[in-house]
């Protein structure tokens, strides 16, 4: 047992010096101790004779010791025991080292204990250090030591001797090693003895087997020579070829049978197996068999093909029924979990979802089951969606905020309802998309023939399902929204409602709702109704205004026109605030709400207020002032919307038409004002006469005066007549003409700018005619200049000064 020798572990360990365990110290040098000299010791030792071991009276018996090692061990123990001890000498030598030791035996025992403890600690460290370079061999050594320890009683081991570091310990370990080797050899011999009968049989059968081998080689050589012989029988070859052909046909038929039929395991799985991926793999095989059966029919194997096709159809009918039940169970389980744990969507990596979608692909091949399943899903989800829709309308519900109709803000109520429906749509769309929308990465795992055949239906399945489910809410939504639209009279509110409906229609279509969906049609119908209500508000307002008795105060527009324009501009503000005009601003809008009330309703009502306008110039003048005031208010109120509401072609035309009507009325009022001034000064007849000859406004220089020479033939051109008709009126009126025009004629014109412009232009016309008429008279009557100057007492500058013009 050299492997148990402690000196074998004296190799340096990897690591720092601090980690090294202390090694046993060397024997003490007795020569270094104080005591007698070496020569004296030698003399004393030589003087003493070694005691004979065999003649001692001891209990050591060497006769029964056959083992050399045992005899040597006993001899060494006896030698140590009989060694003479000199107490004084030992005490003198070791008193500096071990002052408490009384003899050599005590010193040796204590040294052995200390050394054993140190070595045990070092051995434990070595055997348990995983970083030791010989860790694997250490593990085997540790295992061997543990086996020895477990069998210590059986082997009769003396542990104190085995671990001694001296010669006796080494001798004990070698003895133990030899004993273990003997035991190991005994075990090996016992094992080999068990194989001895087998070896005997092999040796006994070796010669017969060799003979058989030689005979078989001779037979094979003879057969090979016979095959190479030209005398081979053709009948045997023909039979052999037929046999090979039959074997080949058998293999082909077996392959066809396996490709066209289901084995017992597949049949059992199809009928009673659990719906999983392996079940669908069997269905894939059935679909391939069905496709091959059509090939058989096309290859003149009609009977076999039809029989196979009928059998496969029965299998497929059974499989479709089981898949149909599985899909329904999947949805019912989901509904049950929803009631317990709440609504949830399926994740993309859900294994059950992948199986569900694969099953749905297979079921799409059977329209009867597929349509029935879709109807059940639609019915199930519709009921759930309707219940969720009605919850907020219950005042005492505990599941969320209630939606309450307020008379002060119906648009908000309608918006809350639409927002609630949109949230239901979004949630339902996400759920159906997670359940029925096929992802690209999943399509590769599905049966491509079925998927490609029904690709259009399957890829749009979630959209169609969403439209079918949401359509069931159309009546409930219509009931709650239509009453708001029908009973609302305010134009701006109905416009807001139409805007909301149009906006949510757009949002619904972006979520996948189709234009022909019942719910979307409800939004369209209600939006049209809201727009109609908006238009009807203004048309009914105008109808009521026409029925009322016209009231004119200070030639100002009627009150209804001001109220109408306020309501109309409020609508325009709403339209400007929206992102688009939502189709309400069109030709009919401008015709009914702008053109007709302004050009027809107001002007006709104004004419009714002044029935004598065609006969009385004064009444006509007041009518013009009233119409100008009304159109001026209309144009000024609609002016800010010129670049937006009236930006299109027809709107711009309507606005320009109002401007032209206003300009026309201003021109007519200017003409009437000019005639009033001419009439007040007595020059009206002469003004008309001169204009019939040549327009007075076209006179540029004195040469043009000659064109009026023909006017002297008229009786009214005599100086006496002129003096009678003009002199007194002219001298009396001109000083007060400015005040008369501003404070009498144009007093009720609402726009100061229009009043100043009309007065200024009419005064310019009068002053121009005054100068032309006086100059023509001076030219016609050159000898009566003094008389003419007495009639026209004011010069041109004086007239302009009196009239307040430049």
Swiss-Prot record:
Q: Where in the cell is it found?
A: Golgi apparatus membrane
- Would you identify the family this protein belongs to, as annotated? Belongs to the COG6 family.
PANTHER family referenced in this protein's UniProt entry, alphabetically? COMPONENT OF OLIGOMERIC GOLGI COMPLEX 6, CONSERVED OLIGOMERIC GOLGI COMPLEX SUBUNIT 6
Q: Which InterPro entries match?
A: COG6, COG6_C, COG6_N
**Function (record text):** Acts as a component of the peripheral membrane COG complex that is involved in intra-Golgi protein trafficking. COG is located at the cis-Golgi, and regulates tethering of retrograde intra-Golgi vesicles and possibly a number of other membrane trafficking events.
- Record GO cellular component, one term: Golgi membrane
The protein's organism comes out as Eremothecium gossypii (strain ATCC 10895 / CBS 109.51 / FGSC 9923 / NRRL Y-1056) (Yeast)
Going by the UniProt record, its keywords in alphabetical order are: Golgi apparatus, Membrane, Protein transport, Transport
Where mainly found?
A: Golgi
Question: Single Gene Ontology BP term?
Answer: intra-Golgi vesicle-mediated transport
Q: How does it sit in the membrane?
A: Peripheral membrane protein
- List the SMART domains: COG6
Q: Please, which domain of life does this record's source organism belong to?
A: Eukaryota
Q: Which residues form the signal peptide?
A: none
Name of the featured protein: Conserved oligomeric Golgi complex subunit 6
């Amino acid at each position: 047992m050299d492997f148990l020798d402690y000196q074998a572990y004296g190799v340096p360990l990897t690591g720092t010096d601090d980690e090294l365990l202390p090694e046993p110290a060397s024997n003490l040098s007795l020569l270094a101790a104080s005591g007698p000299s070496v020569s004296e010791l030698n003399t004393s030792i030589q003087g003493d004779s070694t005691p004979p071991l065999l003649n001692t009276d001891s209990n050591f018996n060497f006769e029964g010791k056959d083992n050399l090692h045992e005899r040597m061990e006993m001899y060494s123990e006896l030698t140590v025991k009989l060694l003479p001890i000199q107490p004084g000498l030992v005490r003198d030598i070791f008193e500096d080292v071990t002052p408490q030791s009384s003899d050599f035996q005590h010193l040796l025992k204590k040294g052995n204990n200390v050394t054993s403890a140190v070595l045990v600690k070092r051995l434990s460290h070595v055997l348990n250090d995983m970083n030791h370079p010989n860790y694997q061999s250490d593990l085997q050594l540790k295992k061997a030591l543990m086996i020895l320890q477990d069998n210590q009683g059986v082997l009769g081991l003396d542990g104190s001797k085995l671990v001694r570091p001296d010669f006796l310990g080494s001798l004990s370990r070698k003895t133990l090693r030899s004993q273990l080797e003997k035991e190991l050899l005994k075990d090996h011999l016992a094992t080999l003895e068990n194989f001895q009968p087998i070896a005997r049989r092999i040796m006994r059968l070796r010669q017969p087997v060799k003979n058989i081998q030689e005979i078989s080689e001779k037979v094979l050589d003879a057969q090979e020579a016979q095959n190479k012989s030209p005398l081979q029988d053709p009948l045997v070859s023909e039979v052999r070829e037929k046999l090979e052909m039959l074997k080949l046909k058998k293999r082909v038929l077996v392959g066809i049978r396996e490709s066209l039929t289901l084995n017992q395991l597949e049949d059992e799985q199809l009928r009673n197996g659990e719906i999983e991926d392996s079940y669908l793999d069997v269905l894939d095989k059935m679909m391939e068999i069905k496709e091959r059966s059509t090939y058989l029919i096309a290859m003149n194997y009609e009977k076999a093909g039809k029989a196979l096709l009928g059998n496969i159809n029965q299998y497929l009918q059974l499989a479709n029924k089981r898949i149909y039940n599985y899909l329904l169970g999947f949805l019912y389980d989901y509904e049950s979990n929803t009631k317990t744990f709440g609504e949830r969507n399926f994740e993309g990596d859900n294994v059950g979802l992948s199986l569900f979608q694969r099953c749905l692909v297979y079921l799409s091949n059977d329209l009867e089951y597929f349509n029935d399943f879709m109807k059940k899903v639609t019915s199930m989800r519709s009921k759930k969606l309707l219940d969720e829709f009605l919850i907020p309308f219950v005042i005492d519900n505990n599941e969320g905020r209630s939606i309450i109709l307020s008379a002060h803000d119906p648009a908000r109520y309608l918006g809350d309802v639409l927002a609630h429906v949109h949230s239901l749509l979004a949630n339902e769309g996400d759920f159906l998309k997670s359940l029925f929308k096929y992802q690209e990465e999943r399509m590769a795992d599905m049966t491509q023939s079925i998927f490609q055949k029904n690709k259009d239906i399957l890829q749009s399945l979630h959209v169609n399902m969403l439209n079918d489910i949401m359509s069931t809410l159309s009546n409930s939504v219509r009931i709650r929204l239509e009453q708001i639209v029908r009973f609302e009279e305010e134009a701006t509110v109905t416009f807001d409602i139409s805007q909301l409906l149009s906006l949510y229609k757009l949002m619904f279509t972006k979520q996948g709702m189709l234009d022909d969906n019942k719910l979307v049609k409800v939004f369209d119908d209600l939006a049209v109704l809201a727009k109609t209500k908006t238009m009807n508000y203004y048309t009914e307002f105008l109808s009521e205004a026409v029925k009322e008795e016209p009231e004119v105060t200070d030639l100002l527009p009627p009150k209804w026109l001001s109220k109408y324009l306020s309501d109309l501009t409020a609508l325009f503000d709403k339209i400007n605030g929206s992102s688009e005009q939502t189709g309400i601003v069109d030709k009919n809008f401008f015709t009914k709400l702008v053109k007709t009330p302004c050009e027809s309703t107001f002007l006709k009502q104004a004419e009714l207020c002044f029935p004598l306008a065609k006969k009385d110039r004064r009444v006509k003048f007041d009518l013009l002032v009233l119409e100008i005031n009304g159109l001026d208010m209309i144009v000024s109120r609609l002016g800010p919307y010129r670049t937006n509401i009236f930006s299109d072609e027809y709107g711009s035309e309507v606005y320009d038409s109002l401007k032209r009507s206003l300009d026309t009325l201003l021109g007519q009022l200017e003409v009437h004002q000019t005639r009033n001034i001419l009439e007040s000064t007595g020059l009206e007849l002469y003004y008309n006469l001169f204009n019939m000859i040549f327009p007075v406004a076209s006179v540029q220089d004195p040469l043009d005066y000659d064109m009026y020479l023909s006017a002297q033939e008229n009786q009214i051109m005599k100086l006496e007549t002129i003096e009678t008709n003009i002199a007194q009126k002219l001298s009396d009126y001109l000083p007060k003409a400015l005040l008369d025009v501003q404070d009498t004629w144009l007093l009720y014109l609402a726009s100061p700018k229009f009043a100043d412009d009309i007065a200024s232009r009419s005064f310019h016309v009068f002053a121009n005619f005054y100068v032309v008429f006086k100059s023509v008279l001076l030219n016609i009557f050159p000898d009566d200049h003094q008389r003419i100057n007495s009639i026209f007492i004011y010069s041109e500058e004086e007239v302009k000064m009196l009239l307040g013009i430049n």
